[in-house]
Amino acid sequence: MANSSSGMAVDDECKLKFMELKAKRNFRFIVFKIEEKVQQVTVERLGQPNESYDDFTECLPPNECRYAVFDFDFVTDENCQKSKIFFISWSPDTSRVRSKMLYASTKDRFKRELDGIQVELQATDPSEMSMDIIKARAF
């Protein structure tokens, strides 16, 4: 179903792959992009379970917006193994204004399609989504 405010639809693959990340942990991360020609949010890249946070950040284009989810594993102060699913809205300062507006107007609707997101992060440059920030937001 298309989003009335931005006219964007969400490809079923987005929801299916997110469910696999959440339930089966088949992926470490998923990068999504808006395909303007077809007015739809689609899966751009799937990160394998052995890929790192650096692998994830390197696949975000420096001049284009993206949405992403990252499954972050960590150990608490009580020595418990935990995991949190981050939703990251990547909107670099150098991206086109139209693109930033499109991603901003579609974000909430798209996020609602992904049931199970625990932490949301918005970043306009890599420093705003450093590993230190991810760790701080996870706890």
Swiss-Prot record:
Preferentially in mature anther. The keyword Transferase does not apply. One of its GO terms (biological process) is actin filament depolymerization. Actin-depolymerizing protein. Severs actin filaments (F-actin) and binds to actin monomers. GO terms for molecular function: actin binding. Keywords: Actin-binding. It holds the Pfam family Cofilin_ADF. One of its GO terms (cellular component) is actin cytoskeleton. The keyword Manganese does not apply. Gene3D superfamilies: Severin (3.40.20.10). Residues 5-139 form the ADF-H domain. Belongs to the actin-binding proteins ADF family. This is Actin-depolymerizing factor. SUPFAM superfamilies: Actin depolymerizing proteins (SSF55753). It comes from Lilium longiflorum (Trumpet lily).
